[in-house]
Amino acid sequence: MPFFSYDTVKKILFNFDPETAHTLAGIGLRALPCCPPLLHFITKQYFVTDPMIEQEFFGRTFKNPVGLGAGFDKNGQYITSMPALGFGFTEIGTVTPKPQPGNPKPRLFRLLEDRSIQNAMGFNNRGMGYMLEQLNKLYFFDYPIGINIGKNKVTSEEKALEDYETLFHAFKDYGDYIVINISSPNTPGLRDLQNEQFIKDIFAMAKRITEQPVLLKIAPDMTHEDAIALCNTAVDAGAAGIIATNTTIDYSLTPHAKDFGGISGALLTEKSYQLFKAIGKELYGKTLLISVGGIDSAEEAYRRIKAGASLVQVYSMLIYKGPALIREINEGLIKLLKKDGYTHISEAIGADWK
């Protein structure tokens, strides 16, 4: 049993505005490694691994298939605390070449009735220099890390490749994979880069600079046909995988939405799944697929896995359910695999298409 109730913690944090609550949670996560006995104790409460759900990707062992989605740890400050929350891997960022404050506040909102989050953060982060400092502190920390990269707001679309080039050079020897983020709705013009020519150019550039696996993260707000075409272009150009999806700007999903920013959480679940399913049918077996967007249970994670996901990511639903959710997903996946007669998760990946 967990040694504390997340419901109690949530009640306290939800007394603050969302961004302040995030800052307070971050202070706790940064402090946790300073008390190894407590870190070890919490890790034992929440971290689940089993040969059935352990996998190898990019030359690294992923002890379980549930990772933290990008956006929570924008500056790489909480990496060593992530196993304590139950995650098998983490994705830090989005990081930009130069520090930037992001969009004006308020820019983060809880949609309580919908168990969702709406954010218009705008890649607020301390820049690549600060993140490199954090990564250089890790030394012998053996844990899969993805680095999510994006362009600065002040960088024009015409010069966007220059920002990504700078970031590829900076992180070519760090982490286990790099994610190209051109799908956030909160940087003006960024989603316009989701076109065939830019995809070809950026992956060609990546291959010249780094041997790191480079993945593409896509938005949910496109037709299935366009998404499949974009992903095929990326894979043909050298993408090591696809992450689907980012937040949605479909404000028709709820009457509680603001008219700006991206929506994540429960409202995104079905939209994200349907797009991922279309991509999975086309690309399963051709590249690594990671599904993210409103995953709030083992059953939902399993649905994504059967549609082709080798890994899944969680962020917004962590805020509503706490780290017990990650434990429940991993334990639930083991039960679901056994129920269907599988001996390893790899047998279930893409089961809908076998």
Swiss-Prot record:
Monomer. The gene is pyrD. GO terms for biological process: 'de novo' pyrimidine nucleobase biosynthetic process; 'de novo' UMP biosynthetic process. Its cofactor is FMN. Keywords: Cell membrane, Flavoprotein, FMN, Membrane, Oxidoreductase, Pyrimidine biosynthesis. Its EC number is 1.3.5.2. The lineage of its organism: Bacteria, Pseudomonadati, Campylobacterota, Epsilonproteobacteria, Campylobacterales. Pathway: Pyrimidine metabolism; UMP biosynthesis via de novo pathway; orotate from (S)-dihydroorotate (quinone route): step 1/1. It comes from Sulfurovum sp. (strain NBC37-1). Substrate binds at residues 74, 119-123, 181, 186, 246-247. FMN binds at residues 70-74, 94, 148, 181, 217, 245, 265, 294, 315-316. It is a peripheral membrane protein. Binds 1 FMN per subunit. This is Dihydroorotate dehydrogenase (quinone). Catalyzes the conversion of dihydroorotate to orotate with quinone as electron acceptor. Gene3D superfamilies: Aldolase class I (3.20.20.70).
